[in-house]
From Swiss-Prot:
Compartmental location: Cell inner membrane
Cofactor note: Binds 1 Mg(2+) ion per monomer.
Encoding gene (name): dgcQ
Site entry: Transition state stabilizer: 438
Lineage, top ranks: Bacteria, Pseudomonadati, Pseudomonadota, Gammaproteobacteria, Enterobacterales
Boundaries of every GGDEF domain copy: 425-560
Name used for this protein in its record: Probable diguanylate cyclase DgcQ
Length: 567
């Protein structure tokens, strides 16, 4: 029947309320509300975080794409020049001017330095060193059978290399055969030798050997040492020239770091938040978009190590380093990585910071209101519960000692004894009586006696275990029920109670203190296998009498005849 089900549910709720108490129910409900509100807020925070990370990547990606396109143009041009030289090596032009240049080379190759020039208006001059200079190192060689073709191909390169490339400072071809061509002119004289020597000793030339660069692709090199002035720092892209498995030389482009810095600063002007930083493949800072003399966002060694570990895993990503959020992306046409550093201050001042602050304030306001409501409702429920249950509490407890009264103690103890008998677990009882209590009433009055009883009850309650129960069963008599305690454990608890009562002094009047003692008797179900509480309490009371007869302030845990035998 529906009506019966409703009654059953009401009974179930009443049992739950009696078991846990209304305070626990209120706490649980508010805890669940707090938990769900926190989870919802946390979900919004995670969504906001993902949006912030995506925004950082979008800003970085737009700048990285533009920079990559600029660098790609230069790389495509470098590859175009190499392809042109390769075609000239395979099928050289039969121009008389080129043949004349080869003849001039044969005449001048023994000179300490020399120069070949076809047309000052349309091509670039060719500079070279002597056979003796080339023979000094195994890295250089003029033993190629296609030396004449390489020479004419380099002169043809002069027509193509004259046109400027974006961001490029210098474009050059350096041959292992002792000559070079550059978009930057060289004064005729000993500068030719020193410049060629400088070229062939650079990493971008040496590292392009077939052993060190077996892939024969573009490689990047930096000259960003601390002792190099900012205006002299540059990055170099180099590409080897090969034909029939023979390495002829290196095509290279120098890009000044100042050009890259200006590009990043132009990008930063459009993006008022964040700082862009360009690093090489060793995570050495090349340049950034920060104004002059402002380097507070530079990464330290520890942060660079953390970033390097993350970069090894993916081509782009983000990482929080202290109060900075660093998003990074590898460039496709540069052997390095571009970073966008966003500080906490910039984040707070931005749109996402405003949303985060508003979300935090809303959560804090809701939490504060929830806590205030919880306190008010819990206080109201507690008062109602106390008012509702005060007659029952008064019926079960002794008003003076706030321990169970005799009837309540016997009822609860009997139920506990039955439960522990079924579980075959130990069960013990302590009967306690305050020594010479009648003389306290006679000497100091009943008010002092009440104070002694309340004091003793407080010591008993603070000494027993959490699941033990204690009650006042007579004038100055107390009974303590110890479920789960053996006789030996009960003796230890009784001794602690006796010592605490005996050690504490009680202020019975304004100028008088009193030290009291207690005698106790102990009984346990393990002695005779009897779990009847009234029998155990009676036996403990009997042993209490033996303790008093033996001199008081002591504990008796066995029959008097056994005590005498022990003595």
């Amino acid at each position: 029947m529906p009506h019966e089900t409703l009654l059953d549910n009401q009974g179930w709720f009443k049992k739950l309320a009696r078991r846990f108490g209304p305070g626990h129910v209120v706490n649980t409900c508010f805890l669940i509300v707090m938990l769900f509100s926190t989870l919802l807020t946390w979900r919004e925070v995670m969504i906001l975080k993902d949006a912030y990370v995506a925004s950082q990547r979008n800003h970085l990606g737009s700048v990285a794409n533009v920079l990559d396109r600029q660098l790609q143009f230069n790389m495509d041009r470098l590859i175009f020049l190499r392809n042109g030289m390769h075609e000239a090596l395979v099928a050289p032009l039969a121009f008389s001017a080129l043949q004349s240049a080869v003849t001039q080379f044969e005449q001048r190759r023994v000179r300490h330095f020399w120069q070949l020039e076809l047309d000052k208006r349309r091509t670039l001059p060719l500079y070279g060193v002597s056979d003796q200079f080339v023979a000094r190192t195994t890295l250089l060689s003029r033993e190629s059978r296609d030396l004449a073709n390489e020479l004419t191909a380099t002169l043809e390169l002069g027509y193509l290399a004259r046109s400027s490339a974006m961001l490029t400072l210098e474009t050059m071809y350096v041959s292992r055969s002792g000559f070079y061509l550059s978009t930057l002119p060289t004064a005729y004289g000993s500068d030719i030798v020193s410049r060629y020597y400088q070229y062939v000793t650079q990493p971008w030339f040496i590292e392009q050997s077939q052993r060190r660069n077996p892939q024969r692709g573009v490689r990047w090199f930096t000259s960003a040492q601390p002792y190099v002035a900012d205006e002299q720092k540059k990055v170099t892209a180099s590409l080897p020239l090969d034909h029939d498995n023979y390495w002829y030389g290196v095509l290279a482009m120098d890009i000044p770091v100042a050009s890259l810095q200006q590009f990043l600063r132009d990008a930063a002007e459009k993006d008022i938040e964040g700082e862009y930083q360009l690093y090489d493949n060793h995570l050495r800072l090349l340049t950034d978009s920060a104004p002059e003399q402002q380097t507070e966002n530079t990464l330290n060694d520890r942060e660079r190590a953390l970033l390097a570990r993350e970069i090894e895993k993916d081509t782009l990503g983000g990482l929080r380093l202290g109060t900075h959020y660093v998003s990074w992306e590898r460039l496709d046409h540069f052997d390095g990585v571009l970073l966008r550093v966003h500080t906490l201050r910039e984040g707070i001042q931005g749109n996402f910071g405003s949303i985060s602050i508003a979300l935090t304030l809303l959560w804090g306001l809701f939490t504060a209101m929830l806590l205030i409501s919880w306190g008010v409702i819990r206080h109201m429920v507690k008062n109602m519960f106390v008012l509702q249950n005060s007659p029952q509490w008064q019926a079960w407890h002794d008003p003076l000692t706030r321990l169970y009264n005799r009837g309540a103690l016997f009822e609860k103890a009997s139920r506990l004894a039955k439960r522990y008998r079924e579980a075959r677990q130990p069960f013990s009882v302590i009967q306690l009586d305050l020594d010479y209590f009648k003389s306290v009433n006679d000497r100091f009055g009943h008010q002092a006696g009440d104070r002694v009883l309340s004091h003793a009850a407080g010591l008993i309650g603070s000494t027993i275990r959490a699941h033990d129960i204690a009650g006042r069963v007579g004038g100055e008599e107390f009974c303590i029920v110890l479920p789960g305690a053996t006789k030996a454990q009960a003796l230890q608890i009784a001794e602690r109670i006796r010592q605490r009562i005996n050690d504490k002094e009680i202020l019975v009047t304004k100028s008088t203190t009193l030290r009291i003692s207690a005698s106790m008797g102990i009984s346990s179900a393990e002695e005779y296998g009897d779990y009847d509480f009234e029998q155990l309490q009676s036996l403990a009371d009997k042993r209490l009498y033996y303790a008093k007869q033996s001199g008081r302030n002591r504990i008796c845990a066995s029959d008097a005849t056994q005590e005498r035998e022990k003595k």
